Amino acid sequence: MSEDKMNGRSIRINRLPATIVAILLTFVLVYFLNFHQEERPAIYGMLRSENPSRVNLRKMLIAAIQAAQRGGLEVLDVARSRQLKERSKGKTDEGVNDPFTDADGRSHCVMKQGLQRIFPRVQIFSEEDKEHCKQAHGYDLDPTVLHETAQIPDVTVNAQDVTVWVDPLDATKEFTEELYEYVTTMVCVAVAGRPIIGVIHSPFNGQTAWAWVGNSMSEYLSNLHPQHSPNNQAPIITVSRSHTAGAKDLARGIFGENVSLLTAAGAGYKVLQVVANNATAYLHTSKIKKWDICAGDAILHALGGTMTTLNDQLINYGPEESPVNTEGLLATLEQHDEYMDKLSKYREAHNGKLA
C-alpha cells in the first residue's frame, strides 16, 4: 500500500488488483500464442525456430498452394484489365509463336519471390526467371488452405535436397486467345530429384488440385479422379493443340485404329484430363520444360500413375539436371507398361523414330 497527500487528505491506493490483471493478461497471451498458432497465419511461420538447413514439407505444401493461387490472382487481374502487353519470346520447335504477357511476369514475381522469402535456402526455378521484378512480394503461411483434409504430418528434409519448379502461367498462347480453360499456375517440390508435392491451380474456375505423395491430396483432386475406370476402355490420347498435324496417324500407328485423340493445351490441363479419365494417356513427342510437367508428375504419382520419358525413364528434377526434358513423355494412370510396349514396338518398326 502507499499514501499520497491531496487537499490535505490521505488517499490509499491498492496495487493488488493491478497486479492480478497483469498476471491474467500474461496467461491469456501465453495461451493465445501457444494454442492458437493454426488460427494465426501471420505468425505461424515465425513462432517455431527451425534448423535453417532443414525444410518442413508441410509448410512447403502450404506455401506452394498459396503461391499457385496468388499467381492465379495476378493472371485473373491482367485478363480482366485486357492490358496483356503481349510480346514474343520466339518460336517453339513446332514453329508456333511463344508469347509472353504481363500476366506471366506478374505471376512469376508473386510466386517465386513469395516462396523464396519463406525458403531462402531452397533452389527455385521458374519459367520466367529472366523477368525483373520491380517490387518485392511476400506472404505469410496460411494453414487454412489445408482445411479440407485430415492432419498432415510435419516432415523435414535437407534443404539442399529440395528443388522447386514454378510455372507462373501454363498455356500462355491460349491465355492470349481467351481459351481460359487451359490456363493453370503450377508449383512442384522435388526431393532428391523426385517430385513429391504437386500443385495445379486453374485461375478461371478457382479450383486447386494438389497432392503430397504418400500423404494427402486436395478434396478437388480426389473428387476429380473416378474410383473405377471402365473395363477394356479404348485408348484416348491427349496431345498438344500445336501437334495436331500428324498426331492422329501417329497415335493410330502406336495404339491401334480404335484410338481417339483429345487435343488440348497446357501440360497441367492435360494431366488433369488423365486424372479425370477423360484421357487414358498424355503423349508428348518433343522436348518439354520441367516446370511444365513436374507438378503433374507428382500428382499422377500420388494417384498411383506414372510419367516417364519415351525411353521409359523416370524424369529427374534435381537442381543439377537440365531444365529441359528432351526425350518426350508418356503419362498414364493405368496400363503404362502396356502403352510403353506398344510405343517401343512402333519405334522398332520405324528405325527408332516416332514420326
From Swiss-Prot:
Membrane topology label: Single-pass membrane protein
Name of the protein in question: Putative inositol monophosphatase 3
Record-listed substrate binding positions: E127, L169, D170, A171, T172, D292
The species this protein was found in: Drosophila melanogaster (Fruit fly)
Sites where the protein binds Mg(2+) 1: E127, D167, L169
CDD domains linked to this entry: IPPase
Catalysed reactions, as listed in the record: a myo-inositol phosphate + H2O = myo-inositol + phosphate
Pathway per the UniProt entry: Polyol metabolism; myo-inositol biosynthesis; myo-inositol from D-glucose 6-phosphate: step 2/2
A single Gene Ontology CC term: membrane
Homology family: Belongs to the inositol monophosphatase superfamily.
Single Gene Ontology BP annotation: phosphatidylinositol phosphate biosynthetic process
Transmembrane intervals: 16-36
Keywords from the UniProt entry: Hydrolase, Magnesium, Membrane, Metal-binding, Transmembrane, Transmembrane helix
Record's subcellular location: Membrane
